[in-house]
């Protein structure tokens, strides 16, 4: 499990507005603190956010957060919930579960009234509010979460124990039974506002060190630090070896090998690609372009040069293409009839059977070096399918794979309702790909009556516009799809 400290500061952050103390003037990045928040990435890749601070947008850009599986809130104070509206770019099209006590959920409903009213304001985040009760464990993703009762002065709030890690912020007091529960922790995030001067609702650093000792001296990270805490470098000199001065961008990794504390390093893609929107282009011209890019990439590999990866998006005039293993009997009219309709048939080197390309369809041709991405051909095809599945989910459509057939389908397991929304057929040589996918956006589906699409006579074909009952902004859909490609392939 990875724990990334997105923010390590108290409610005012550091530097504090209007303050000129030496901590606020420090040029050490470790002394610059946004409001406290923690991102957990599970071994299965699920992402859980603890508290959503007013600095979430800045923190998310730093950490490359583009999806979350759940949000856990400790209490309703603004420095812990002020970033909830910024979740809109992550969950405007699918629900995100937010876990908190009932009084916190009520506060959120009041604060974000425009989100939860009968007719929500367009584009607001889809938040599913889930009640949590102290000492009643619940499941989030692949983890068991144990809520713990702690006191924030007179205000009862929650801490969270997740496996062998615990997160306690804004705590002043904790009961003996909760201390006992924490003794199995190997990693603890715990608040310490300032070194020694008493505060009515927060622990001091000295008190935090004492609490850590009561728990059994697990590896610990101090959080929710103010500008009255020591400078980071001075702090390192006075803290015991197992207690770390938290800072924005600290990462703690906990596994069977132990616990490692390090600087978080934002993910860098193994390989970028060049994107080219070819607009409306004849199929033959696009085929010539991809073949040139493909042969240039293969030649680069033969000369031990790094090939350039290219993603082409095209929109074609009506045309039919037949893969190298396709069956001409799946063309339901003669070539002379095709000619009379001014539709050309191309025999091409991709896999798959016969399909149609035409206006309103995004035809994508990735010329990618799969070795740069560290994947094989099967994983690549699954990645193409996943990109389409992720895109159409934005429109509320559930895309799925179908056993024994490539592409993306709707209702693949319901006889008589199965329909294909995206066809996939590729060629690969020396791990370089060409051809790709055809996604029906505003496509005239009558053309598919001329063929058994992809060799199937018992399955239908659909488009995004057919499913939603209205034409889509084609340019916007292309932009959204390219962003999905950039995210998914960039994560490899």
Swiss-Prot record:
Site location (Lowers pKa of active site Cys): 420
Region ranges (Unknown): 1-255
Official protein name in the record: Octanoyltransferase
Matching Gene3D superfamilies: Bira Bifunctional Protein, Domain 2, Ribonuclease Z/Hydroxyacylglutathione hydrolase-like
Keyword Acyltransferase: yes
InterPro entries named among the record's database cross-references: aa-tRNA-synth_II/BPL/LPL, BPL_LPL_catalytic, Metallo-B-lactamas, Octanoyltransferase, Octanoyltransferase_CS, RibonucZ/Hydroxyglut_hydro
Gene behind this protein: lipB
Its job: Catalyzes the transfer of endogenously produced octanoic acid from octanoyl-acyl-carrier-protein onto the lipoyl domains of lipoate-dependent enzymes. Lipoyl-ACP can also act as a substrate although octanoyl-ACP is likely to be the physiological substrate.
Residues that, per the record, bind substrate: 350-357, 423-425, 436-438
Subcellular location: Cytoplasm
UniProt similarity note: In the C-terminal section; belongs to the LipB family.
Reactions accelerated catalytically: octanoyl-[ACP] + L-lysyl-[protein] = N(6)-octanoyl-L-lysyl-[protein] + holo-[ACP] + H(+)
GO biological-process terms attached to the record: protein modification process
Region (LipB domain): 256-492
Pfam families in alphabetical order: Lactamase_B_2, LplA-B_cat
Keyword Transferase (UniProt): yes
Active site (UniProt): 454 (acyl-thioester intermediate)
Alphabetized GO MF terms: lipoyl(octanoyl) transferase activity
Note: In the reaction, the free carboxyl group of octanoic acid is attached via an amide linkage to the epsilon-amino group of a specific lysine residue of lipoyl domains of lipoate-dependent enzymes.
Assigned EC number: 2.3.1.181
């Amino acid at each position: 499990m990875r724990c990334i400290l997105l923010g390590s500061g108290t409610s005012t952050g550091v530097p504090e507005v209007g303050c000129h103390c030496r901590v606020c003037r420090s040029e050490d990045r470790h002394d610059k603190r946004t409001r406290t928040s923690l991102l957990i990435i599970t071994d299965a890749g699920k992402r859980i956010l603890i508290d959503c601070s007013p600095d979430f947008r800045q923190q998310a850009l730093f950490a490359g957060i583009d999806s979350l599986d759940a949000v856990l809130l400790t209490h309703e104070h603004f420095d812990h919930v002020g970033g909830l509206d910024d979740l809109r770019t992550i969950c405007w099209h699918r629900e995100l579960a937010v876990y908190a006590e009932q009084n916190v959920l009520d506060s959120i409903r009041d604060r974000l009234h425009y989100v939860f009213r009968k007719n929500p304001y367009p584009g607001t985040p889809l938040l599913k509010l889930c009640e949590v009760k102290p000492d009643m464990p619940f499941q989030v993703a692949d983890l068991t979460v144990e809520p713990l009762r702690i006191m924030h002065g007179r205000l009862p709030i929650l801490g969270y124990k997740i496996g062998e890690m615990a997160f306690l912020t804004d705590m002043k007091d904790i009961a003996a039974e909760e201390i006992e529960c924490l003794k199995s922790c190997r990693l603890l995030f715990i608040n310490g506002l300032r070194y020694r001067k008493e505060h009515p609702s927060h622990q001091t650093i000295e008190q935090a060190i004492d609490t850590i000792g009561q728990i059994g001296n697990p590896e610990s990270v101090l959080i929710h630090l103010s500008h009255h805490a020591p400078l980071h470098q001075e702090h390192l000199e006075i803290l015991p070896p197992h207690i770390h001065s938290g800072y924005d961008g600290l990462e703690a990794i906990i596994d069977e090998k132990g616990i490692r504390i390090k600087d978080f390093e934002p993910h860098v893609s193994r390989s970028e690609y060049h994107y080219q929107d070819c607009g409306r282009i004849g199929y033959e011209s696009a085929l010539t372009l991809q073949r040139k890019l493909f042969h240039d990439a293969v030649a680069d590999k033969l000369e031990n040069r790094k090939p350039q990866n290219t993603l082409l998006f095209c929109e074609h005039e009506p045309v039919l293409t037949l893969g190298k293993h396709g069956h001409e009997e799946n063309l339901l009219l003669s070539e002379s009839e095709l000619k009379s309709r001014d539709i050309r048939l191309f025999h091409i080197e991709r896999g798959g059977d016969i399909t149609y390309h035409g206006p309103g369809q995004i035809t994508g041709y990735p010329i990618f070096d799969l070795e740069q991405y560290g994947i094989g051909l099967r994983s690549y095809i699954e990645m193409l399918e996943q990109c389409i599945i992720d895109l159409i989910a934005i429109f509320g459509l559930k895309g799925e794979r179908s056993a024994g057939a490539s592409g993306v389908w709707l209702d693949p397991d319901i006889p008589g309702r199965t329909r294909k929304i995206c066809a996939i057929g590729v060629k690969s040589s020396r791990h370089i790909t060409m051809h790709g996918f055809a996604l029906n956006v505003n496509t005239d589906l009558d053309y598919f009556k001329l063929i058994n699409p992809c060799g199937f006579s018992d399955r239908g074909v659909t488009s995004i516009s057919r499913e939603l009952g209205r034409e889509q902004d084609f340019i916007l859909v292309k932009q959204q799809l390219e962003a999905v490609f950039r995210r998914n392939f960039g994560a490899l």
